[in-house]
């Protein structure tokens, strides 16, 4: 089992977040790419499976090397467009991603997600990508349109998807 941090998150978080350059697109095209290259180099003869949570599953389509995995397990990942959220949650999502993300990110140079009970702080670019996923009807498609190539359409492995039922 291998785990890793994206730049700007966990142990890869810089001491100063203001102005730190990272985005979900960089996580998928560079950070995840580095991991997949490491796996291909060091574990050539092993069976390979991938467990991706949230953005960890979404970014698989940003890297052609995702083909190395026999099967996937996706946990809590989805087309995150606000229109797919329960009506009771939409106003909070609109306030958070429509106002809080751009205002706090512009003022602080990063998004203090922990202030809002949303986990650890995010680099500004990652917060704006998250905002894009929530506020745009095309959601993931809108994000993938900003990378060199969308590899998600070539992924045909069996996948177990674990999600919470809407109530």
Predicted regions and their residues:
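Conserved alpha/beta-hydrolase
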Residues: 1-15
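Conserved catalytic-core motifs of eukaryotic protein kinase domains, centered on the activation segment
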Residues: 13-18, 85
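Alpha/beta-hydrolase active-site loop
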Residues: 21-40
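Short coil/turn segments at beta-strand junctions that form active-site/ligand-binding loops
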Residues: 45-47, 70, 157-158
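Alpha/beta-hydrolase-fold enzymes
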Residues: 51, 55-138
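Active-site nucleophile elbow and catalytic-triad environment of alpha/beta-hydrolase enzymes
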Residues: 133-151
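Short beta-strand/loop motif that positions the catalytic acidic residue
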Residues: 155, 161-163
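Acidic catalytic loop of the alpha/beta-hydrolase fold
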Residues: 165-167
């Amino acid at each position: 089992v291998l785990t890793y941090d994206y730049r700007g998150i966990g142990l890869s978080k810089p001491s100063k977040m203001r102005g730190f350059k990272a985005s979900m697109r960089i996580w998928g095209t560079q950070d995840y790419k580095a991991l997949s290259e490491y796996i291909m180099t060091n574990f050539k003869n092993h069976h390979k499976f991938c467990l991706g949570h949230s953005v960890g599953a979404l970014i698989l389509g940003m890297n052609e090397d995702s083909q190395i995995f026999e099967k996937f397990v996706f946990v809590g990942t989805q087309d995150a467009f606000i229109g797919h959220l329960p009506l009771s949650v939409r106003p909070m999502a609109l306030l958070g991603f429509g106002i809080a993300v751009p205002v706090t990110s512009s003022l602080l140079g990063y998004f203090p997600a922990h202030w809002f009970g949303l986990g650890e702080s995010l680099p500004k670019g990652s917060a704006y990508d998250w905002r894009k996923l929530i506020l745009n009807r095309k959601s993931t498609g809108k994000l993938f349109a900003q990378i060199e190539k969308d590899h998600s359409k070539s992924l045909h492995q069996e996948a177990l998807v674990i999600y919470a039922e809407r109530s």
